[in-house]
């Protein structure tokens, strides 16, 4: 029976490389998958999932008003798995569509993304995945300053920590860093 998986981690925890690994494992056995990502994330191009170690693949971009359920249901070949990158940017309706893919089409969905933003608020997509997912797993990484488990994301602008501003600002290593709680409140900058 298919399930909805939510795998979250801070920046630089290996979420995208995990997607690419899972896709490779399915495809190596001749089982097609669908890789999707938020249309908001254009760091490496529109509709591209890209890991920090250099691996990348094309993906289907998801807009907030996309009917994901209908898109998957109308594919000529039923996928063995749907893999979602940057799931924190999904809308509530996107997440409910993913649950329908699992429940009505019996296709497993694995959604990967951040849980909380730089202000320690849940993203809309993360909130609804936490509510609806059958299985929730944390992908761990370490604090940039002390090597404890990183649980938060620190936004850095002009060499200084930022705790206010727009929730969504697409960036990479130069803007966001994984930190533990202690170094979120007292970064060693």
Curated annotation (Swiss-Prot):
Designated name of the protein: Thymidine kinase
Residues reported to bind Zn(2+): 143, 146, 180, 183
Keywords per UniProt: ATP-binding, Cytoplasm, DNA synthesis, Kinase, Metal-binding, Nucleotide-binding, Transferase, Zinc
Main localization of the protein described in the UniProt heading: cytoplasm
Keyword Cytoplasm carried by entry: yes
GO CC annotation terms, alphabetical: cytosol
Species for this entry: Streptococcus pyogenes serotype M3 (strain ATCC BAA-595 / MGAS315)
Keyword set includes rRNA-binding: no
